[in-house]
Curated annotation (Swiss-Prot):
Assembly mode: Homotetramer.
SUPFAM superfamilies noted in UniProt: Chorismate synthase, AroC
Name by which UniProt lists this protein: Chorismate synthase
NCBIfam families with a match to the protein in the record: aroC, PRK05382.1
Amino acid sequence: MSSIFGKIFRVSTFGESHGGAVGVILDGCPPKLKINIDLIQNELDRRRPGQSKITTPRKEDDKLEILSGLKEGITLGTPIAMLVRNKDQRPEDYNNLEQVFRPSHADGTYHLKYGIQAGSGGGRASARETIGRVAAGAIAKQLLKTLFNTEILSWVKRIHDIDSQVNKNKLTLSKIDSNIVRCPDEKVATKMIQRIKELQQEGDSCGGVIECLVKNVPSGLGMPVFDKLEADLAKALMSLPATKGFEIGSGFLGTYLRGSEHNDSFVESDDINKLKTKSNNSGGIQGGISNGENIEMKIAFKPTATIGKEQKTVNSDGKEIVMKAKGRHDPCVLPRAVPMVDSMVALVLADHLLLHQAQCSIIK
């Protein structure tokens, strides 16, 4: 089913943007894992609407409720149910759009598939659905951190045509979160914020690129052919709202190189299980399996589809109309998408870790 993700570390999200609540059921989490609930809440706060002048003005505290699966902060190995209640819904903002197919939204395709759709807030297509992913991903991050000291760092690399260059060796979470746009390059971040504000005042929006770095990745994650690690990462990240592109390692720029330039040569080592490579054009994955190097990815997000300008479209009768959106929306989704990217990467790695252990650790 389309609301379920993962094979062993398995999540099922539920809820709509303007419904009573949104949440997740996480199944397959190993027992006896100590969970810091404050860290889950912190990830939700990073995703929360209304956190700055360049995000949607919708006001939600996004307070986490854990209904099952933990005892005194320790996982039981049973399903972990988590939810966040919606408190600032305004479905009346969408009354005039009930039968309108908004440009580049899911209204038209949902109607074509189901013959019915949630009229307000985008329903399941809303980024509010990602609350469940972020909550479950925060647990996955703690599992990976506990076992391998794995660290997942995502940041805004580009907004519109304003790009940044970041020293990944000095990258920290505190640097990423040092400004409201979540770009660790302070000078570039200032320009990004200004660009978003300008477009916001014009009733317009913009997109950009989020980059993700994963450090201390255990080798051996992923499988050949259909369950390659990069394939599952691509699927996970492209399932996020507004995503339009994914690349790993050298990505599309690697097509400009020769094989002699692109190949990642292994370095001599006394421990064959701790191999290193001279370069990392592969982005930490070869043959669909992690090699222990950093995993490096980029994800492209389109401009927010809801804008304050008049646009021509059609209604459910196929008649052309002119519409102007109301409601509360982000002029740029990227600052709030950073924890979403972190979470989807964590969910994939946690699932592949358990799959690897199940297949390859039973016989010594």
